[in-house]
């Protein structure tokens, strides 16, 4: 009788030890894999930001060249010599169609807006006039403009009378390209991540779900200055993401950021299956023993 109790105690002890080893193994494997996945996602985020910068640089070179070619056309120069807003506004429609941009602005040498072509009716000459001095007074030729819920990347080009070397400015040409849902999806594919453009307290465009956009506004800082997440974990709509951000220069404030995010939960979803497999193996080993 005593031998049976001893064997029973021994068996229970073996079961307890095996179970403890199994669960310890599960925890160690899970933490190790999670850490490796985290490091992999952080590297992917860095690569995604690099891919965005390369894509954006090539895009900006192309669009800046388009603005320079358009500003150098003889008919554009001749148009600006009229100094007549009605004439310039009428003729600018053909230029806008030729440029293929989402926005076109012409201003005289004093910075007065003479023509504006864009689709949203809420973007008026008055709003363009408020924005334009910030652009023309800057040394940069590329800017971001958030107006009435629309975000544009704009390119400024001088219109010269005669050769550019003469530096006799007739006026200015501004071409704008909107960051819409299509552009956000394209950037998401290039970065192989979710993306979100945030301007102050507004998510302008993103590939996130609406609930996740609201959470991003709540948990993420307004700007990367001063130590924003660079591959840190944030929760959006009950899902864990690793995120980083890129500052995009805008005249004045608030700040404009591009957020790049990868789902940590999706990347570690396989761990549930792995845990079940290890648990089954552990129980099999216990029963076989």
Residue ranges and their predicted role:
Residues 186, 244, 258-281:
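Membrane-interface helix-start motif
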Residues 81-103, 112-148, 180-192, 201-238:
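Extracytoplasmic/periplasmic sensor domains and loops in membrane signaling proteins
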Residues 22-48, 52, 56:
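N-terminal membrane-insertion alpha helix
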Residues 4-32, 279-288:
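Extreme N-terminal signal-anchor transmembrane helix of membrane signaling/transducer proteins, especially
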Residues 140, 149-163, 228-231, 237-247, ...:
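A short beta-strand signature within small-molecule sensing/ligand-binding domains used
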Residues 45-66, 70-79:
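N-terminal alpha-helical signal peptides/signal-anchor transmembrane segments
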Residues 67, 101-106, 194-197:
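Short, hydrophobic-rich beta-strand element in sensory/regulatory alpha-beta domains
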Residues 170-171, 255-258:
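Short beta-strand edge/capping elements of PAS-family sensory modules
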